[in-house]
Amino acid sequence: MPCGSSYLRHMLNDLLVIETAGILAGPSVGMHFAELGARVIKIENKRAGGDVTRQWKLTTEDPRSPVSAYFSSVNWGKQHRLLDLRSAEDRAVFDALLTTADMLITNHLAADAEKLGLTRERLRTVNPGLLHGHIKGFADQPERPAFDVVLQAETGYISMTGTDTDHLAKMPIALIDVLAAHQLKEGLLL
């Protein structure tokens, strides 16, 4: 069997991935699939004006730009749709996309997933064959958000990057998010 990125890119050309994830880990998974040739549609929160990271700009970035470098770094190659999944009209549009999708990537807290109609039970009724990749930081605490810096602290990484115990420092890269994204991508590819 041939290997390499061009082979995978060709293999995934017919794959439709829908992504509702935000920030870094979930969107990175979607971008990995876009890089491999899949068609990825990122659904952004219409109420919020899109993914919050669109506005996470450095002082060196053009304030008039519609997107930040941060947003661009994990959303390459995707199509974007603004939908309010709490609205019946937009939920119908979303469900129509899901009926033809192969995969859905999410990273919402359990209560938010319920409000947005993204529970596994409901998704099974919309598309029984849908592969659902979900990033969750704390399996035993479904309502606890898992931001990278929190996980760096809980895993001890912060204690390894500071100068001493009184001067702890966050790693300059969101390593936990990056690792989570790669793990989910690999799991979905299997």
Across the structure, where does each feature detected by a protein language model lie?
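N-terminal helix-loop segment corresponding to the beta1-alpha1 unit
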Residues: P2-L190
